[in-house]
Amino acid sequence: GGERSMTEQVQAGTLHMTAVTSGVLANFVPEVGIIELPFIYPDKKTAYRVLDDKDVQQRIAKFCEPKGFVFIGYTENEFRDMTNSKHPIKKPQDLQGLKIRVVEGPVFIDTFKTLGANPTPLPFPEIYNALQQKVIDGQDNPLYTSVLMKFTEVNKFATVTNHILTECPVVVNAKFWKSLTPEQQKIFREAAAVQIKTNREGNAKGSADAIQKAKAQKVDVYVLTAKDREVFRKAVQPVYDKYKGIYGNEWYDFFVKKIDSYSKKK
């Protein structure tokens, strides 16, 4: 099923566990959406340090509890990039009016609206057909995923934007979790820790040659420069302002301070 449907099933207890895009989980637990704010991390190393920080994880777990979820870790879908069938995207204005498939989550919808695109939420399994039938002009997924899922067969323009890092929280139904022994719970947590390490390593390998593979398919690939990223970051300021109000100053400021602090460490 789609992510939203699976999350509803975990909440209801018909599914015991799922890994879900933070943006989709934010429909149930708004505060976790902060993980996927656009252009918020300067680089992947900083992002991992923040997301693996014990205080950050404890807070995420606390936000999930009242909604019937137990947070035990993440899976990862890498930094996201953009592909489309119309033209290269090098600046926010290039997104004007483009119908872009987005994750069914508020941060994604608001990000692309703010950048001038026409965000179209669709479940992941429907992307290829929607691109092929020109229901949408483009989509955002890691370039590695776009090559793997053959989106680059129908979208010949790609931009390595690294705009949103998709770490997918692994959530377990609270009732099911309570039925487990402490030893069983420990096994679940340990498995989640091994899984994210393997996941991140695999993504790094896959991403390393994604540009080369896309170019071999005659895809026009543009990589945002640091200057380009700054222009995009300024353009999404209204998204930060809106979600600071939703998450509350305390959680937002705490998270941003963690990013600042870790970005200064070598």
Labelled PLM ranges:
Residues 1-46, 55, 62-266:
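N-terminal secretory/targeting leader peptides
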